[in-house]
Amino acid sequence: MYSFEQAITQLFQQLSLSIPDTIEPVIGVKVGEFACHITEHPVGQILMFTLPSLDNNDEKETLLSHNIFSQDILKPILSWDEVGGHPVLWNRQPLNSLDNNSLYTQLEMLVQGAERLQTSSLISPPRSFS
Protein backbone atom coordinates (compact mmCIF):
# COMPACT_ATOMS: atom_id res chain seq x y z
CA MET A 1 0.00 0.00 0.00
CA TYR A 2 1.22 3.47 -0.87
CA SER A 3 1.21 6.45 1.42
CA PHE A 4 0.05 9.80 0.03
CA GLU A 5 3.66 11.02 0.01
CA GLN A 6 4.87 7.94 -1.90
CA ALA A 7 2.05 8.32 -4.43
CA ILE A 8 2.90 12.00 -5.04
CA THR A 9 6.60 11.18 -5.38
CA GLN A 10 5.82 8.48 -7.95
CA LEU A 11 3.51 10.79 -9.94
CA PHE A 12 6.06 13.62 -9.99
CA GLN A 13 8.71 11.16 -11.24
CA GLN A 14 6.38 9.99 -14.03
CA LEU A 15 5.71 13.61 -15.01
CA SER A 16 9.46 14.42 -14.90
CA LEU A 17 8.82 17.11 -12.29
CA SER A 18 11.12 17.89 -9.41
CA ILE A 19 9.81 16.36 -6.22
CA PRO A 20 8.94 19.00 -3.59
CA ASP A 21 11.03 18.98 -0.41
CA THR A 22 7.82 19.09 1.60
CA ILE A 23 4.68 17.41 0.34
CA GLU A 24 1.79 19.59 1.46
CA PRO A 25 -1.70 18.16 2.20
CA VAL A 26 -2.88 19.63 -1.13
CA ILE A 27 -0.46 19.55 -4.07
CA GLY A 28 -1.00 21.47 -7.29
CA VAL A 29 0.11 20.36 -10.74
CA LYS A 30 -0.33 22.44 -13.89
CA VAL A 31 -1.25 20.33 -16.93
CA GLY A 32 -1.66 22.49 -20.01
CA GLU A 33 -4.08 25.23 -19.02
CA PHE A 34 -5.51 23.29 -16.07
CA ALA A 35 -4.45 23.59 -12.44
CA CYS A 36 -5.05 20.15 -10.96
CA HIS A 37 -5.08 19.71 -7.19
CA ILE A 38 -4.28 16.43 -5.45
CA THR A 39 -5.03 15.51 -1.85
CA GLU A 40 -5.87 12.53 0.34
CA HIS A 41 -9.59 12.84 0.97
CA PRO A 42 -11.12 10.97 2.64
CA VAL A 43 -8.27 9.14 4.36
CA GLY A 44 -7.04 6.33 2.14
CA GLN A 45 -8.30 7.93 -1.11
CA ILE A 46 -6.40 10.02 -3.67
CA LEU A 47 -8.68 12.86 -4.73
CA MET A 48 -7.84 14.97 -7.79
CA PHE A 49 -9.85 18.00 -8.83
CA THR A 50 -9.77 20.96 -11.16
CA LEU A 51 -11.96 24.02 -11.55
CA PRO A 52 -12.88 24.18 -15.23
CA SER A 53 -14.01 27.53 -16.54
CA LEU A 54 -17.23 26.91 -18.37
CA ASP A 55 -18.70 29.49 -20.72
CA ASN A 56 -22.24 29.06 -19.51
CA ASN A 57 -22.68 27.23 -16.25
CA ASP A 58 -26.35 28.27 -16.15
CA GLU A 59 -27.12 25.09 -18.08
CA LYS A 60 -26.22 22.73 -15.25
CA GLU A 61 -28.62 20.01 -16.41
CA THR A 62 -26.89 19.83 -19.76
CA LEU A 63 -23.43 19.82 -18.20
CA LEU A 64 -24.45 17.16 -15.69
CA SER A 65 -25.31 14.86 -18.60
CA HIS A 66 -21.54 14.22 -18.68
CA ASN A 67 -21.93 12.35 -15.36
CA ILE A 68 -23.21 9.17 -17.00
CA PHE A 69 -22.45 6.00 -15.02
CA SER A 70 -19.26 4.24 -16.00
CA GLN A 71 -17.44 1.03 -15.15
CA ASP A 72 -14.26 3.10 -14.95
CA ILE A 73 -13.83 4.28 -11.36
CA LEU A 74 -11.47 7.03 -12.51
CA LYS A 75 -14.06 8.75 -14.72
CA PRO A 76 -14.30 12.36 -13.55
CA ILE A 77 -17.50 13.67 -11.97
CA LEU A 78 -18.77 17.22 -12.43
CA SER A 79 -20.14 18.99 -9.35
CA TRP A 80 -20.65 22.52 -8.06
CA ASP A 81 -19.04 23.81 -4.89
CA GLU A 82 -21.45 24.73 -2.11
CA VAL A 83 -19.96 28.14 -1.35
CA GLY A 84 -19.44 29.86 -4.69
CA GLY A 85 -21.44 27.64 -7.00
CA HIS A 86 -18.38 27.09 -9.22
CA PRO A 87 -17.96 23.91 -11.26
CA VAL A 88 -15.56 21.30 -9.86
CA LEU A 89 -14.43 18.28 -11.86
CA TRP A 90 -13.05 15.52 -9.64
CA ASN A 91 -12.13 11.86 -9.43
CA ARG A 92 -10.61 9.61 -6.78
CA GLN A 93 -9.28 6.13 -6.15
CA PRO A 94 -8.20 4.10 -3.13
CA LEU A 95 -4.54 4.38 -2.15
CA ASN A 96 -4.42 0.63 -1.57
CA SER A 97 -5.28 -0.13 -5.21
CA LEU A 98 -2.59 2.04 -6.82
CA ASP A 99 -0.21 0.54 -9.33
CA ASN A 100 2.62 2.11 -11.32
CA ASN A 101 0.35 3.88 -13.80
CA SER A 102 -2.96 4.45 -12.02
CA LEU A 103 -2.16 7.94 -10.66
CA TYR A 104 -0.93 9.08 -14.06
CA THR A 105 -4.09 7.62 -15.64
CA GLN A 106 -6.26 9.35 -13.02
CA LEU A 107 -4.65 12.72 -13.78
CA GLU A 108 -4.88 12.12 -17.52
CA MET A 109 -8.61 11.30 -17.29
CA LEU A 110 -9.25 14.40 -15.18
CA VAL A 111 -7.56 16.66 -17.73
CA GLN A 112 -9.28 14.95 -20.67
CA GLY A 113 -12.64 15.44 -18.93
CA ALA A 114 -11.91 19.13 -18.34
CA GLU A 115 -10.86 19.57 -21.97
CA ARG A 116 -14.07 17.89 -23.15
CA LEU A 117 -16.19 20.18 -20.99
CA GLN A 118 -14.45 23.30 -22.24
CA THR A 119 -14.17 22.48 -25.92
CA SER A 120 -17.43 20.71 -26.60
CA SER A 121 -20.37 22.87 -27.41
CA LEU A 122 -23.18 22.29 -24.99
CA ILE A 123 -25.16 19.31 -26.11
CA SER A 124 -28.85 18.83 -25.60
CA PRO A 125 -29.82 17.07 -22.41
CA PRO A 126 -30.72 13.41 -22.80
CA ARG A 127 -34.19 12.74 -24.16
CA SER A 128 -36.75 11.55 -21.69
CA PHE A 129 -38.38 8.24 -22.42
CA SER A 130 -42.09 7.73 -22.04
Swiss-Prot record:
Keyword Ribosomal protein tagged: no
Q: Which CDD domains match?
A: T3SC_IA_SycE_SpcS-like
Q: Which Gene3D superfamilies match?
A: 3.30.1460.10
Q: Supply the alphabetized keyword list.
A: Activator, Plasmid, Transcription, Transcription regulation, Virulence
List, in alphabetical order, the GO biological process terms annotated in this UniProt record: protein secretion by the type III secretion system
Q: Which SUPFAM superfamilies does this entry report, sorted A to Z?
A: Type III secretory system chaperone-like
Instruction: State the disulfide connectivity.
Output: none
| Function description | Positive regulator of YopE.
Q: What is this protein called?
A: YopE regulator
Source organism of this protein record:
Yersinia pestis
Task: Provide the organism lineage as a comma list.
Answer: Bacteria, Pseudomonadati, Pseudomonadota, Gammaproteobacteria, Enterobacterales
* Name of the gene encoding the protein in the UniProt record: yerA
